[in-house]
Design a protein with these regions (language model features):
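N-terminal membrane-sensor/transducer module of prokaryotic signaling receptors
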Residues: 1-17, 48, 69-72, 80, ...
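A generic fold-level signal
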Residues: 24, 55, 81, 117-121, ...
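Surface-exposed alpha-helical segments enriched in charged/polar residues
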Residues: 20-23, 88-91, 127
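PAS-family sensory/regulatory domains
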Residues: 55-81
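Per-ARNT-Sim (PAS) sensory domains and their PAS-associated C-terminal
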Residues: 77-124, 135
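Sensory modules in modular signal-transduction proteins
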Residues: 8-48, 165, 173
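Sensory coupling linkers of modular signal transduction proteins
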Residues: 2-8, 127-163, 168
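PAS/PAS-like sensory domain cap-loop motif
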Residues: 45-59
Length: 175
């Protein structure tokens, strides 16, 4: 059935279902404009936080409690922001009007009270979209910290295994 032929109840039920999914999926979705201002997000529902008042705006780094954004007073103002791979990928996507996938970065985020630094590994993808004639990007932010930690441990174990194998070979050769 084409959408325009569905009843308002069916459309509302589908909208409610989609909203519920987005509010409970294990990733942050952020709709941002070319100034890195967050226009919409599921961040608040995932963290069980009250949504900001209507009219209040936040940039991506401010919303995620980026340590550099907090130190500089605003997202994008810290000297380290120029070196941020995620910021560069977003800027390039807006400039080229295209999407990007799986940009990985290690970040230092602050807790809600901004008194504790939390190291975090993220994977960010961005889908370029035009809404009402305005350029936007839908960012998908995955916390991959646990995955990266397991990867680091596996690399250490692999190096230890190689070292043990060399010692074993040397020992056998000297017998």
């Amino acid at each position: 059935i084409p959408p325009y032929e569905e009843s308002k109840d069916v459309i509302q039920r589908k909208l409610d279902q989609t909203t519920m999914i987005l509010q409970n999926i294990n990733a942050y979705f952020l709709l941002i404009d070319k100034d890195f201002i967050v226009c919409d997000t599921n961040y608040y529902s995932l963290n069980k936080l009250p949504a900001p008042e209507v009219g209040m705006t936040q940039k991506v780094g401010d919303l995620l409690h980026c340590r550099n954004a907090a130190e500089a007073g605003e997202c994008g103002m810290h000297q380290q922001c120029k070196l941020c791979g995620i910021r560069a990928a977003i800027g390039r996507a807006f400039h080229k009007k295209e999407s990007f996938q799986k940009v990985n970065a290690s970040m230092n985020l602050l807790n809600d009270k901004e008194d504790k630094v939390i190291p975090c590994d993220v994977s960010v993808s961005g889908a370029y979209v035009v809404i009402n004639g305005e350029d936007h990007i839908v960012l998908t932010v995955y916390d991959v910290t646990e995955l990266q930690n397991v990867q680091r441990l596996l690399n250490i174990e692999r190096k230890n295994s190689i070292s043990a194998e060399r010692l074993k070979s040397t020992f056998i050769a000297n017998i």
